[in-house]
Regions:
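C-terminal catalytic "cap/lid" subdomain
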Residues: 1-234
Length: 234
């Protein structure tokens, strides 16, 4: 069903059960899923969050300037991308980290054509550093990169199997949506992504699939056209 996707992973997901730091079991499990999908023919670019290390907005009111705090958060995404890339390489798949601002020799400066070349030869492109600007979330960065590389869909990997009427971890009566339009998600105040990311995806006709990244085989199922998670579309 999909040939090329942008996979968005939260920083907390890389931090394991505690959501802090880097959890090698989580990194290894995600790398195996990503590598299996890549070997099956899916072209995958990845944008990681940085909340397991630092999030700029959390520093406001604690002595951190928002602009500098966001810069620290962007650096956290680079650390996460470098860590995940190593585990992907261990699975026999090329993994190249790109950054939104120049950081050679740590990683390559992001150029759309260079990232696409990695995808076309079967590798994984990890695009770090958000948009390179403060006040933009990594969700917005993921939406931007998905549009730039011509992805068929933006996949948001979470720890729940889709979008619900309420938080299923807190409300046992919450009901899962199989499909939603952007307008429905906004009107129902379902926080799938922030408004800027929504606007980018809506304007660019970029579908979003919210799914459980911790369930083995979900990425490969998407390639086969199987229904996984919740589809949010224009």
């Amino acid at each position: 069903m999909y040939k090329r996707v942008l996979l968005k992973l939260s920083g907390e997901s890389l931090g394991g059960p505690a959501g802090k730091g880097l959890d090698t079991d989580s990194l290894s499990a995600y790398a195996k899923e990503i590598a299996a999908a890549a070997k099956a023919g899916l072209q995958i670019a990845i944008v990681n969050g940085g909340g397991n290390i630092f999030r700029g907005l959390q520093g406001v009111g604690k002595g951190f300037d928002r602009v500098d705090g966001d810069k620290m958060g962007m650096l956290a995404t680079v650390i996460n991308s470098l860590a995940l890339s190593m585990f992907i390489k261990d699975e026999g798949i090329e993994a190249q980290v790109f950054t939104a601002t120049p950081m050679e020799p740590v990683a390559k400066y992001y150029m759309r054509d260079d990232a696409v070349k990695v995808l076309e030869r079967g590798g994984v492109a990890l695009i770090a550093g958000g948009t390179g600007n403060p006040f933009f979330t990594t969700d917005s960065g993921a939406a931007l990169r998905a549009l730039e590389i011509g992805a068929d869909a933006l996949l948001k990997g979470t720890r729940v199997d889709g979008v619900y009427t309420a938080d299923p971890e807190k409300d046992p009566t919450a009901v899962k949506y199989d499909e939603l339009t952007f307008d429905e998600a906004i009107s129902k105040h379902l926080k799938v992504m922030d408004q800027t990311a929504y606007a980018l995806c809506s304007d660019g006709n970029m579908p979003i699939i919210v799914f459980d990244m911790n369930a083995t085989g979900n990425l490969t199922k998407l390639i086969k056209g199987e229904k996984v998670g919740t589809l949010v579309h224009p």
